Amino acid sequence: MERNPPDGTGPVHVPLGHIVASEKWRGSQLAQEMQGKVRLIFEEGLASADFYLSSKSCILYVTEADLVAGHGYRKRLARFRNSSHLQGIIIVEKTQMSEQYFPAVQKFTVLDLGMVLLPVASQSEASCLIIHLVQEQTREPSKNPFLRKKRSMLSELSLVQTVQQIPGVGKVKAPLLLQKFPSIQQLSNASVQELEEVVGPAAAQQIHTFFTQPKRQQPRS
């Protein structure tokens, strides 16, 4: 296998059907859940990404502990975004303990970094998601024109999930908003009046406040 770059930003050679994982995940519940379903190769020196699904895509994993601890995870995500040419998918543990911190990481990753964000409730759920992503790439050769559609669908799924998490939205209003405002950028720039036409005054005010309120520091645990 080709040696990986020292900064861990890729590209990394990943055999088809394998996952190259950071050594820090060895022995974790997440790694144990995946073993037997896909082949894991652990490597040192993957500074930014946690799991490489292919030479072009990787996963950056934010744990419950990362969120509760504060903003430390942001430097890693921003460093990856600024230095890597890979398709990065961010998986975040949204649990009962970390739920209060989720809007901040959602806003940072989707609005500030423009990256795909997928919330999971546990490492077990995350393992299923990662395995599914690997299996999709294994089934479809890189030249398959439908692979781009799959990646587009993943981005759309992330977008819908992101909008659902905005205060005042939920599963019913998210698709309605995305029909009129197809991107987070357009939604964030919408006026209260424009939002009212879709979701009514109360929800419109909540959505507008979410995008316009100044960023606050997370309380220390």
Curated annotation (Swiss-Prot):
Single GO molecular function: DNA binding
First-listed, main subcellular location of the protein, grouped into a coarse class: nucleus
Gene3D superfamilies: 3.40.50.10130, 5' to 3' exonuclease, C-terminal subdomain
Pfam families referenced in this protein's UniProt entry, alphabetically: HHH_2, PND
The keyword DNA damage is assigned to this record: yes
Cross-referenced InterPro entries: DisA/LigA_HHH, FAAP24, PND, RuvA_2-like
Disulfide partners: none
A single GO BP: interstrand cross-link repair
Cellular component GO terms held in the UniProt record: chromatin; FANCM-MHF complex; Fanconi anaemia nuclear complex; nucleoplasm
Alphabetized UniProt keyword annotations: DNA damage, DNA repair, DNA-binding, Nucleus
Localisation: Nucleus
Free-text note regarding domains: The C-terminal region is distantly related to RuvA domain 2, a DNA-binding domain.
Function in brief: Plays a role in DNA repair through recruitment of the FA core complex to damaged DNA. Regulates FANCD2 monoubiquitination upon DNA damage. Induces chromosomal instability as well as hypersensitivity to DNA cross-linking agents, when repressed. Targets FANCM/FAAP24 complex to the DNA, preferentially to single strand DNA.
Full protein name: Fanconi anemia core complex-associated protein 24
Organism the protein comes from: Mus musculus
